[in-house]
């Protein structure tokens, strides 16, 4: 069989296959299907799994260095649609309840003496890499280079999932990182929760603190109470974990989050609407059933859902009708114009259609910063609205 060597011909594909516990045949199949692709960051060459393949997680990265260092992709966290009996069936004994933060998933690693922050998809994000170096004491990766720090970057000033958190407000910037998992980066094995917490406290690293530790037989009662409290506070939800991480975590989100997701999706409804709609409405239906809502409570839930869908949709149509090209806007803070330009290059590399809406220098207690508003354009939504407003028929 002819091997697909590409630009990685300088590297031993047999060793790469061995590292991943794959056959050469499977490795070439991943190349030919464009599941395994090349990437580069500041002349650091990597291979990246764009999809799950033969047990290798999406977002898994192989650094093409002498060691062929592997960073496994973060596994998908499955969702509980019902609290009971799902939690009782899934867990062994005790259940650790942690808050689910509304941000973007990042893995922090140290390879050949350099720190990198990888997105869920496996790209080295220059914006996030610079921020975690600034925010965190990363000496832990000097002592435990085999680990990856898995966590959530949260705050309104982030380029992927902007949402305000008062606990990460720094005056001129609302951004921060919380660790929710520490894994062996080549095996994806998680540390037990107590061990992870001890390490975070030893190195003074911010981490997601457990809200409760409960017996699995009664966990559904406690989770519901916590979910109702988080819903009132406008928070996202919970992640449920085994204390030893012996079984995979599961998640459960609030009514508030479902509605906020729909609002975001139906602002750009021709691009995102269908992908978001069905799953969230199903979650709401099962939540209404399990929480034994009265007819009045159910009608209120339905009203919330309807408003989350219709109001942003009509607002978008109005904006486009008045000549505006709608975009999802992010306000970001950079240390320099060079950092700003580097991030723009990264976004274009990700095939994002962007527009710079504003850029200015601001004085902070840390010196002069660059504040930029970047708009992500959803062409399909803009173009289809214009088309239908001009009389095109729905096919």
Swiss-Prot record:
Gene3D superfamilies on file: 3.10.450.740, 3.30.1490.70, 3.30.70.2160, DNA ligase/mRNA capping enzyme (3.30.470.30)
Superkingdom, natural source: Archaea
Cross-referenced Pfam families: Lig_C, RNA_ligase
Protein name: Uncharacterized protein MJ0414
Organism per entry: Methanocaldococcus jannaschii (strain ATCC 43067 / DSM 2661 / JAL-1 / JCM 10045 / NBRC 100440)
